[in-house]
Swiss-Prot record:
Belongs to the serpin family. It is found in: Secreted. This is Serine protease inhibitor 42Dd. Induction: Up-regulated by the Gram-positive bacterium M.luteus, the fungus B.bassiana and the yeast C.albicans. GO terms for cellular component: extracellular space. One of its GO terms (molecular function) is serine-type endopeptidase inhibitor activity. SMART domains: SERPIN. Keywords: Glycoprotein, Immunity, Protease inhibitor, Secreted, Serine protease inhibitor, Signal.
Length: 372
């Protein structure tokens, strides 16, 4: 449940978890477009950790790679991350919005919201599930508001039944402009080779400029970094040489931290839009988070009833749109494009590729484009 809601590398708050989440989702959704926000998933699960006790807390700590059982330390760590995001007055808009909804048949532990409200900029909220469609509409409207209208239908009304105890909702909104924009006048109709035997029509953007890029022989792939305006965020694109080389490449670039070199590049990149939805329970169970979803779950820091409760649902929905301006941008500003002659590198993303949106420390989005 994330907006723009994406690859991986260096360290997010819990880098190893980010890698594993993406790998699991990638393998369970083969041959399709994918976009995920690992940091969003980590944040909402760390919120749950704040209300967990006993073996449930230890399970979350282990799966998330949290360095300490000290909840104040965990809160401080995520508080610093979210404060940094809120402090960005220029450049891309990047907003994380998390909420835990609890069936109002179960009383909330009021100390829980006191513990998470400031560091996580969020809280748990009671909700009536006597009317599932009404409850779903309320949650969906909140997600819609948090994502500037991009994430619609987050919760299936049919899933909101009275036996649901708690569900986790997370949205992340991103809007950024390229530091070097594509000129819309240079965008042309073209084709994208999905497989060796299948192609689809696309609108192919083009520009020439200086970018950090490189070709890695052992990866058999080109890598290019596209920075965002007034920001330390960038999108890195991983383009395999072979049309059907993405699967092998995704295995190799886990933990990618290779040097890129500033060079003149003639770049062609398709406009694309990705929407991805998944229920994360099965994925999280594979990460080792199992007790949370059973009657043995100890969430006595979240529920007033010491018998606690379990999490019934972890929904994830992501949306990403890339065009001439950047990510989820509106309007158009023309940029001069000179002749291609003399440029040392040609990168044409006309077949499946992987991407990441990140800064030096945190993975915000990761995904792949199989068919724009």
């Amino acid at each position: 449940m994330y907006y723009l809601c994406i690859f991986l590398w260096v360290t997010s708050v819990a880098c190893q978890t980010s890698k594993e989440i993406y790998q699991l989702l990638s393998k369970s959704h083969t041959n399709q477009n994918l976009v995920v926000s690992p940091v969003s998933i980590e944040t909402i699960l760390s919120m749950v950790f704040m209300g967990a006790e006993g073996s449930t807390a230890k399970e979350l700590q282990s799966a998330l790679g949290l360095p300490s059982e000290d909840k104040e330390a965990v809160a401080a760590r995520y508080g610093a991350l979210l404060n940094d995001l809120q402090g960005q007055e220029e450049g891309p808009i990047l907003k994380l919005a998390n909420r835990i909804y609890v069936n109002d048949q179960y009383s909330l532990n009021q100390n829980y919201n006191l513990a998470v409200r400031e560091p996580f900029k969020s809280e748990a909220e009671s909700i009536s599930l006597t009317n599932g469609p009404v409850a779903a509409e309320r949650i969906n409207q909140w997600v819609l508001d948090q994502t500037s209208g991009k994430i619609k239908g987050m919760i299936d009304p049919g899933s909101m039944t009275s036996d649901v105890k708690a569900l986790l909702v997370n949205a992340i909104y991103f809007k950024g402009q390229w530091e070097s924009k594509f000129d819309p006048a240079k965008t042309r109709a073209s084709t994208f080779q999905v497989t060796a035997n299948k192609s689809v029509p696309v609108q192919m953007m083009a520009q020439m400029g200086t970018f950090r890029a490189n070709y890695f022989r052992d990866l058999d792939a080109q890598v290019i970094e596209l920075p965002y305006l007034n920001s330390n965020l960038s999108m890195t694109i991983f383009l395999p040489r072979e049309v059907e080389g993405l699967s092998a490449l995704e295995e190799k670039i886990v933990g990618f931290a290779r040097p890129l070199v500033a060079k003149e590049v003639y770049l062609k990149l398709p406009k694309f839009k990705i929407e991805f939805r998944d229920e994360l329970k099965e994925t999280l169970e594979k990460l080792g988070i199992r007790e949370l979803f059973t009657d043995k779950s100890d969430l006595s820091g979240l529920f007033a009833d010491k018998s606690g409760g379990k999490v019934s649902q972890v929904s994830h929905k992501a949306f990403l749109e890339v065009n001439e301006e950047g990510a989820e941008a509106a309007g158009a500003t023309s940029v001069a494009v000179t002749n291609r002659a003399g440029f040392s590198t040609f990168l044409m993303a006309d077949h499946p590729f992987a991407f990441v949106i990140r800064d030096a420390n945190t993975i915000y989005f990761q995904g792949r484009v199989v068919s724009p």
